[in-house]
């Protein structure tokens, strides 16, 4: 069965992860099914929550790593992402930065679970963020992985934009919620799509 599935998946094979905020937890179950089917990625592409999941899985597509990803999501709380959440803190953030929340919690999650650079990944990974000036999708493939994932997950109005590579970026889902075109442009012949169905 596994060999028949692989035969129908000409390479390069891209795993494509959609955004979806907390629904990114669904990717763990999808990954388990794909791993059991014996499909292996040549590279990964992710947007927003999917960028975090793609970068996490890029350390190695193993059953243990899939279980670890599920635990990351199971253990995650609202306070982890939005520390000190409350109307007064939100007002202070809105007055200071024009956004509802500080990115400090999201930064800590990223630093806890992801390596610092793309070069430390075992599987090549493209992180999709949206250029604030042009609205276009940009695929980051090398350099500061943590900053790229932070940019990709910076929901407009919730988190402040992120500066990277001399430009300013917001959530990748604004320009490419399911980053099929970036995956195609990077050479994918087969795409295995992990879509949360949101929005």
Task: Give the role of each language-model region.
Residues 1-47, 55-199:
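Patatin-like phospholipase
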């Amino acid at each position: 069965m596994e060999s028949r599935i692989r035969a129908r998946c000409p390479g390069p094979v891209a795993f494509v992860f959609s955004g979806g905020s907390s629904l990114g937890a669904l990717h763990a179950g999808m990954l388990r099914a794909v791993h059991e089917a014996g499909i292996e990625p040549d590279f990964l592409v992710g947007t927003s929550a999917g960028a975090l999941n793609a970068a996490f899985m890029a350390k190695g597509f193993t059953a243990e790593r899939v279980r670890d990803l599920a635990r990351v999501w199971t253990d995650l709380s609202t306070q982890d992402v939005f520390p000190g959440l409350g109307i007064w803190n939100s007002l202070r953030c809105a007055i200071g930065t024009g956004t509802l929340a500080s990115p400090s919690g999201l930064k800590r999650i990223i630093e806890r679970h992801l390596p610092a650079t793309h070069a430390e990944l075992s599987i090549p990974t493209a992180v999709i963020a949206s250029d604030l000036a042009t609205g276009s999708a940009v695929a980051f493939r090398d350099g500061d992985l943590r900053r790229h994932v932070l940019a990709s997950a910076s929901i407009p109005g919730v988190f402040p934009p992120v500066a990277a590579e001399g430009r300013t970026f917001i959530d990748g889902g604004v320009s490419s919620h399911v980053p099929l075109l970036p995956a195609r442009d990077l050479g994918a012949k087969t795409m295995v799509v992990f879509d949360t169905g949101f929005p």
